[in-house]
Amino acid sequence: MLQKFQNHINANFGFLKDKKLLLAFSGGMDSMVLVHLFQKLNLNFALAHCNFQLRGAESDGDENFVAAYAKLNNIACFITKFDTSNYSKENKLSTQVAARNLRYNWFNEILEQEKFDYIVTAHHADDVAETFMINLSRGTGLDGLTGIPSQNGNIIRPMLPFSRKEIENYVLENKLKWREDSSNASDKYLRNKIRHHIIPVFKEINESFLQSFQNTLEHLNQEQSLINDAVQMVYEKVVSEENQQLKINISALLHYKNHKAYLYQWLNKYGFSAWNDVYNLIEAQSGKQI
């Protein structure tokens, strides 16, 4: 895996070699492998660990493990604690969403204060498949089915081509120690249900499921790019932006056969959910602007 990872970095992330990187390090298997690989490649990085205080002594054990590893390997390390439960209640968020918000807000604070260039996370191929299934089960457009991007602004995910099985093998080959999150064994969370019960069925049907899945995502991303070009072209003809408002020329929009699809692409990012009401309003306003 080391050689494959090095080739992947050289081909797709060569720009990281002279950058200052912040690695998200939970102490779990995936991030442990990422840290070890970055050490092998002699990249310039520090570690960042969040103690979300959701698992009592186990969370503190993760923090202690990370701190000890950083000290032993002479790696700079940033550690913080969050009252995640209280934050999620105050902001009416699920625990997972609350933890994500706290995590990335803090990472970005470190980037700004300490002049890091990128955040690096250990998401891998199985994570992408799980996210696809989650979005599919909840209902989504093509955007929700095109996977986790390898780069999203200042967030880098260099392990996306690698499967959980490859990561497990790397741990065994290099005799790495890591921390197991006990919540990963529970089916309380949808992601875990999919990981434990759905993905294994696909792998049983097709031993090369993850590779086939990645090929499919590549095709979907290419098609999404074509759609984005078409959506932008129609947007420029139909929509005007005035005083931070969008004005849609309904007559012009209805000229296009797939006007509902264009509308979805333009407005979905604003959190619309009652799409039937929106579509009915559009058709009722034919010849006008909204």
Question: Language model features by range: what are they?
Answer:
Residues 156-253:
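Contiguous mid-protein beta-loop-alpha structural module that forms a pocket-lining wall or clamp
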Residues 136-137, 203, 282-285:
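Hydrophobic residues in alpha-helical segments
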Residues 2-30, 46-50, 82, 102, ...:
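AMP-forming adenylation/ATP pyrophosphatase catalytic core
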Residues 1-199:
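Core alpha/beta nucleotide-donor-binding catalytic domains of modification enzymes
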